[in-house]
Amino acid sequence: MKKRSPIVAGYFYPDKPGELRSVIEWSFKHGIGPGKPPSPSDIPATNSIGYVAPHAGYIYSGPVAAHVYFDMALNKKPDTIVILGTNHTGLGRPVSVYPEGVWETPLGDLVVDSEIGRLIVENSEIAEFDEYAHLEEHSIEVQLPFIVYIYGEDVKITPIVIGIHTPDIARDLAKSIYEASMSTGKRIIVIASSDFNHYEPHEETSRKDSMAIDRILKLDTDGLYNVILHNDISICGPGGIMTLMEYTKKLGGKAQLLKYATSGDTSGDYSHVVGYAALKFYI
């Protein structure tokens, strides 16, 4: 079986299992995080269908990401997690679906759901099978250790890298994910992996991000696209976020902000920050 090895283990997060578990638990316990790791005694959450999660180094964005995985752990385990990454490298096709195989992490391996991937490609006008876009891309990989931490290896993934970020492509991809879910009856959670505004002072980044988050919470896909464009908001994964918004609308769902912070809140340097948001989509 084809294996995709980690490319940012040892950089964005530790490459040794014990150290990685410790950093994930630090993220849960951090003051910016939920305060503790999830446990069976916690009250079950609403029926989640997706999340927006950041993908920076864990020392910066881990506590915000932990809000996503704390909430996810309180929901019924999905059969498959569709992870929408963003194309930082320029490699591969415009919308690249990883076809089959295993993604390795220091905590365990996750099998690709080739059935869901095939149905997404068949039902989409733009999505294609392509491994090339995934080879050097970190935005999906950074989510996987958190997934293995809460679920072990007993969940499948469908990795998709998005290189063109428009509402029309988001609608096409959302439709294909929805049809794949309906035709298989599988419980799917969609994770849109994205950081928010980049490399401006904390106050300006927070101001810009609040405009984008307002559109996201209203599930206003065209509004999000326009506010990003007209206000120069450097969100790196808007295509995945818009896809999740459109998918949520197909299911009659809503959006909720779990946590917002910037890298300044974890690093102490507020002069040039990156914004991080944990958002939940549910029915």
Curated annotation (Swiss-Prot):
Q: Which Pfam families match?
A: Memo
Recorded hits in Gene3D superfamilies, A to Z, give:
LigB-like
**Recorded superkingdom:** Archaea
Instruction: Spell out the SUPFAM superfamilies in the cross-references.
Output: LigB-like (SSF53213)
- InterPro entries cross-referenced by the UniProt entry: MEMO1_fam
NCBIfam families listed in its UniProt record: AmmeMemoSam_B, PRK00782.1
Protein's name in the database: MEMO1 family protein DKAM_1357
Name its species.
Desulfurococcus amylolyticus (strain DSM 18924 / JCM 16383 / VKM B-2413 / 1221n) (Desulfurococcus kamchatkensis)
